Amino acid sequence: MKLYLDMDGTLVDFVAQVSALGFWRKDKANKVDWAKVKAMGARFWAEMDWINGAEAAFAKLCDMEKRGELELFILSSIDFDSGIEGKKQWLQRNTDFLLEKAIFVTEPEDKAEYAAPDAWLIDDRAKSLDPFAAAGGNVIEFKGDWKATLEAVVGAMNLD
């Protein structure tokens, strides 16, 4: 089975980073000020914290890959170069994950290009999950609980 793992809101705490830096728009509630994010460049992404429970869960998923139980990939959407660079820097600083297995697409919907009957996507957003499922892939919605998410992965492996 191929397991594709989102980054923002799944592995890394995007909301905490935006909040810590005060990068919310003043004119619209709960909207990110992308001009500020882009002005900060790669550092915005590279300096994010792990989301609660993600570091241990990621280590378990990597161990499962080493045992040949699954193929693990990062599948993250970002539409500007400094964001891609920052996400790569984050992976290099915080993991031993091979950058060749990190895939970056422009839009969340583009993740559906990787959908297949043996492919699973863990993501926190419907705008990524729904197109992936519609394209024939399998989805696990991340709801902030890595223990439950890992249980869902193990359950999915037993189905294959």
Residue ranges and their predicted role:
Residues 1-45, 134-135, 147:
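Active-site neighborhood of HAD-like aspartate-dependent phosphohydrolases
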Residues 6, 75-77, 122:
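Short hydrophobic segments within beta-strands
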Residues 12-14, 20, 68-72, 81-85, ...:
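Short catalytic/ligand-binding loop motif for oxyanion handling, primarily in non-cytosolic enzymes
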Residues 48-50, 54-91:
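Substrate-recognition element of Asp-dependent hydrolases with the DxDx(T/V) motif
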Residues 73-82, 88, 96-113:
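A short, structured active-site edge motif that brings together acidic residues
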Residues 86-96, 131-135, 153:
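Short, aromatic/basic amphipathic alpha-helical patches
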